[in-house]
Curated annotation (Swiss-Prot):
One of its GO terms (molecular function) is ATP hydrolysis activity. It holds the Pfam family Peptidase_M41. This is ATP-dependent zinc metalloprotease FtsH 1. It comes from Thermomicrobium roseum (strain ATCC 27502 / DSM 5159 / P-2). It is a multi-pass membrane protein.
Length: 652
């Protein structure tokens, strides 16, 4: 490809040089001749004694007439087949009276004279050839529309192995068998095992689906074809199906190999009913994929690995056994997974001795593998910005805030009242989160603007959580409302800074009622049905499957939950107004507080939730002490103890 480019550029430069030479020859040769003169004028000047000499060039019909006492030179062009001596005699001039000199023609002069006529012709021919080559390239591009755009990674490239993938141990075990099959297919054929046609990797963005598929190819040492689902379909009809055929033809020629289709939901969506009579190019591409995956020979060692974060919209024919035999789920890593991922991404990076990766993993719940990689990279950039040779705790923990909330905006100037209002707002969040047993502990509070936020309060669970209880949701609602309540109690008005808190609280309360069945009034029912439109994809619209009366009751339950959270937050802040002022004052002074600084303001320990159930279901840290436990108490469910410092509020 590069050689053709150099040839094409060289051809263009050659044409330009030839054109420049032609222009130069034309102007220079024309300039040397000077003004022209007729034969009558020359004869008159000779008779008048003005001409010093006549200069002739052999083989040329031009004569240079040089005048006495001046540098003027005029050019006479002889008629065809006319001799200068005969011409002078015709005008009655003796040739002996004139100094006539004859010079041999220069070889370069002949060449330049020839080029004067030849170069324009060569230039036109070159332009025509160049245009023909361009047209030929355009035709080739048009014919290559049906070719696959897959990128091929072979064994001579830097490989990714399972050692570079962490936090997805179960997925690696599932895919280890794929590696075994690609390496030793006869081992499975001897037992009559069927070749696995495809593996579907399902998981949220950033969980390592693409990385894991490349690790499979790296472990097996086979070619790896990578293509995105959106690269199949173009503006021309039939291009998608043609590219699918070409992709699988290449894969068969390079077997054993792996074909990786990223974001397969771009072409693998469930086929519709064909409403409107339109021809859906995407459906034809999907049909071709189904045919190709079902048309493999049993001896063809080609495995298709696809990745998607929307498995619910895929066509059932694509998911049946015989096409994608296995579905491997990749979820966000837990504490141990995050620790393993951090060890992989910090490999080869100079860390300071005080860096605790386990503590870092504990402070990043919900982070995906891509988030953790970005965190380590941001920390390295911060260290380089500060001209450090190593990455320390300060950079890593600051990188967490950058990933979660965005970079700091310390240059933004705000008034003292707005700064104080932000401090009380965030102090309200922190205080209510600290006093509620079922709320997550406060980790960090800051009034430094980050991203689009004027301040933020970070709470972290004590352990990984996969389920939420009603009490935890109610505590979270109270924490959401605490900022607004703090502004109202201190300043007797509320600001727009609580808009996002209100939106999140309303959304959570509505989901508690309509999705999670956490309403005592409406019971464990799910309200609202997802409308599956056949030609637009799934979950486009939500249809009400309940009456207006039920809709009114849903709104009332949402209002009741929000009001209850509001009253809970208000009671806590009223009972601990001194702590609210201390936290706000420290925030104005330091701008950022961690959980230990907030905990130091309290004399009593943080309230712990009282869990009901068999002791084996309770975390060790939350089991009641022998002084408070009653061995003879029954194990059936008991009413939960009231939240400390909160007066019971009647339901509205």
């Amino acid at each position: 490809m590069s050689d053709n480019k150099w040839l094409r550029n060289g051809f263009v430069w050659m044409i330009l040089i030839i054109a420049a030479i032609a222009v130069w020859v034309t102007f220079v040769q024309g300039g040397r001749g000077g003004a022209t003169i007729t034969t009558q004028e020359m004869a008159a000047d000779i008779k008048a004694g003005k001409v010093e000499r006549l200069v002739m060039t052999s083989g040329s019909d031009e004569i240079q007439v040089q005048y006495i006492g001046t540098n003027e030179v005029r050019t006479l062009r002889l008629p065809p087949n006319v001799d200068i001596f005969e011409l002078l005699k015709t005008f009655g001039i003796d040739p002996q009276q004139v100094d006539i000199q004859t010079h041999r023609a220069s070889q370069w002069g002949n060449v330049l004279g020839t080029l004067t006529f030849l170069l324009p012709t060569l230039f036109l021919i070159g332009v025509i050839i160049f245009m023909m080559r361009q047209a030929q390239g355009t035709n080739n591009q048009a014919l290559s529309f049906g070719k696959s755009r897959a990128r091929v990674f072979t064994s001579n490239r830097p490989t990714v192995t399972f050692d570079d993938v962490a936090g997805v141990d179960e997925a690696k075990e599932e895919l280890q068998e794929i590696v075994e099959f690609l390496k030793y297919p006869e081992k499975f054929a001897a037992l009559g095992a069927r070749i696995p046609r495809g593996v579907l990797l399902v998981g949220p963005p950033g969980t390592g689906k693409t990385l894991l598929s490349r690790a499979v190819a790296g472990e097996a040492g086979v070619p790896f074809f990578s293509i995105s689902g959106s690269e199949f379909v173009e503006m021309f009809v039939g291009v998608g199906a043609s590219r699918v055929r070409d992709l699988f033809d290449q894969a068969k020629r390079n077997a054993p190999c792996i074909v990786f289709i990223d974001e397969i939901d771009a072409v693998g969506r469930q086929r519709g009913a064909g409403l409107g009579g339109s021809h859906d190019e995407r459906e034809q591409t999907l049909n071709q994929i189904l045919v190709e995956m079902d048309g493999f020979d049993s001896s063809t060692n080609v495995i298709v690995i696809a990745a998607t974060n929307r498995p619910d919209v895929l066509d059932p024919a694509l998911l049946r056994p015989g096409r994608f035999d296995r579905q491997v789920v990749l979820d966000r890593p837990d504490l141990h997974g995050r620790l393993a991922i951090l060890k992989v991404h910090t490999r080869g990076k100079p860390l300071e001795s005080d860096v605790d990766l386990e503590d870092l993993a504990r402070q990043t719940p919900g982070f995906s593998g891509a988030d953790l990689e970005n965190l380590v990279n941001e920390a390295a950039i911060l260290a380089a910005r500060r001209n450090k040779k190593t990455i320390g705790r300060r950079e890593l923990y600051e990188a967490i805030d950058r990933v979660v909330a965005g970079p700091e905006r310390k240059s933004r100037r705000i008034s003292e009242r707005e700064k104080l209002m932000t401090a009380y707002h965030e102090a309200g969040h922190a205080l209510v989160a600290r006093m509620l047993p079922h709320a997550d502990p406060v980790h960090k509070v800051s009034i430094v603007a980050r991203g689009m936020m004027g301040g933020y309060t970070r709470v972290l669970p004590e352990e990984d959580r996969f389920f939420w209880t009603k009490k935890q949701f109610e505590a979270q609602l109270a924490v959401f409302m605490a900022g607004l309540v703090a502004e109202e109690l201190v300043f007797q008005e509320v600001s727009t800074g609580a808009a996002n808190d209100i939106e999140r609280a309303t959304t959570l309360a509505r989901r508690m009622v309509t999705e999670f069945g956490m309403s005592e009034r409406l019971g464990p029912l799910a309200f609202g049905r997802k409308e599956e439109l056949v030609f637009l994809g799934r979950e486009i619209a939500e249809q009400r499957n309940y009456s207006d009366q039920v809709a009114y009751e849903i709104d009332q339950e949402v209002r009741r939950l929000i009001d209850q959270a509001y009253q809970t937050a208000k009671q806590i802040l009223l009972d601990h107004m001194d702590k609210l002022e201390k936290i706000a004052t420290l925030l104005v002074e330091k701008e950022t507080l961690d959980g230990h600084e907030i905990e130091a303001l309290f004399d009593e320990p943080r309230p712990r939730p009282e869990l009901v159930g068999p002791p084996l279901t309770r975390p060790a840290a939350l089991i009641a002490t022998p002084e408070t436990a009653r061995p003879d108490s029954p194990s059936e469910a008991r009413p939960a103890a009231p939240v400390p410092h909160i007066k019971p509020q009647p339901a509205s």
